[in-house]
Structure formats: C-alpha cells, structure tokens
Amino acid sequence: MTSEQIVYLDENDLIKFCGGKKFKTILADPPWQFQNRTGKVAPEHKRLSRYSTMTLEEIKALPVESVADDNSHLYLWVPNALLPEGLEVMKAWGFQYKGNIVWEKVRKDGFPDGRGVGFYFRNVTELLLFGTKGKNVRTLQPGRSQVNLIRSMKREHSRKPDEIIGLIEKCSNAPFLELFARGERNNWTLWGDQANIDYEPDWDTYANATKAKERKKTKE
C-alpha cells in the first residue's frame, strides 16, 4: 500500500482530502512561526525562507478534530520555545495532553549536537507531545515499556527523525495520518505540500539530510 498524497491548500482542503475517513492516530509537524522568539533564525525570516509558516490561530483552526476517530491518539511536534502554544493547539484539536517523547539530537559520535539554536540555552532536544481523545485510549502493549526518548542525528532544517514512525506504529492503532508530511511512506495517509516522492531540500544543509549525499556526488 502506497501513501496517499496532497498539496497543502487550506484548512477545508484537509476535510475534502480525508473524504469522511477517520484516523486513529495523527502525527503533525506544523510550520510554526517563532516571530520575535528567535529573530533571524526563525524559519519565517526572509533571510532563510525555507518553507511557508502559519500563525498559531491558523494552526488551531485546522479541522483535525473532524478527521480524528472518536478514540484516537495525537503526536504533535513542538519546539521547546513554543510549548505553551503546542498545548493550545492540542486542546483546540480536541485532544488532552498526556505526555511527551523527547528527541535528543546527537552527532556521529553520540554526543549532543550543539549546532542548534536558542535564546536562553542551546537546544539539542525537541518535543513530541502526546495526547488522547475519547475513552480507553491507552497506548498499545509495546508502548507501555517504551521509553520516552529517541536519539538520532539531525537532517535538514525541521525534518524529524524517521525512527519516530516505527515507535508510533508499535504504540498506536491504524489508520495513520501525517499532517505537514515530507516525502512518502507506506501505510500512512500523508497531507502537506512536501508530501511527494520527489521531495528533497533545495538549500545547503547537514550531510545526514534527505538526499544530501546524492547531491554532493552530483556536484563532484
């Protein structure tokens, strides 16, 4: 089974795309706006312009609750500086916060990757908030022994580790929906303007990024 794909248009487009289908598990990586929190390193800053961002109110307005099953799980990526906003979004989408998974970004040698940014501290972690909707919505049996930490190398800006997918598939029920997805994936429904097989970053980035090594070989 191949992934379903669509180009992101607006919030109503999500309902049309899902066509009445309800999802037991939703993974979302919204294009957050940092505004004054990180200044020139924010993704919406004109110097970077890596992808379009959305305001908090625009993200909250997405009809995620309408495409979520009555008994479902939500996994929501949020930068450390925007934790309060992430909790707002989770509530607006009809989910109750239950916990989180921490992504520790590491170098090849396994030590923390200090190339991150941050106004008060140099961030080497990112949070994946976990919330539930409905009744009898505990994680599946493997989830009850799963630690809430993953360690992996960074890829291109904002790209999340693939390791999280296997974790989610073990801990939560299908059908699976990913919002603001990149690339393609079997057994998931993918929604986003970068959800296609040809996706790769078009800016200089880390060596571990999607197809970065292939581009390097081409230049040589």
Q: What function would you assign to each model-found segment?
A:
Residues 1-220:
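Class I S-adenosyl-L-methionine-dependent methyltransferase catalytic core
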